[in-house]
Amino acid sequence: MTQNEKMKTLIEYLESYKLYRAMKELRDKDDAEPLSEAEGARKKMREIRSFVTSMPDSREKLFLYYHYIGGRSMERCAEMLGVAERSIYRIRLRALKLALCCFPGERAAV
């Protein structure tokens, strides 16, 4: 797997948190979803949250948490981190590179 493919897989993994959160909210809203799927979504959310929080403390870790776990926009992340909006894109790239170093291969199958 190339570095670009690994990066894409990592981004899909982190962004899947939003999908699982939506599934959980749907389940909480009405019982349209089977309980086992909701439990699976909660488990996946805990796994992703644990992955992000296990990273070394840094501005990049905060960005990953705010953006992917918290669902905040890039602009809001910049504001929360006290940086210019144009800087948040560099922080995002550094954060993803840092996360890629911690991203185990077995998680590649999102």
Locate the predicted segments by residue.
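N-terminal interaction/assembly modules
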Residues: 1-54, 76, 103-110
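Helix-turn-helix DNA-binding module
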Residues: 70-86
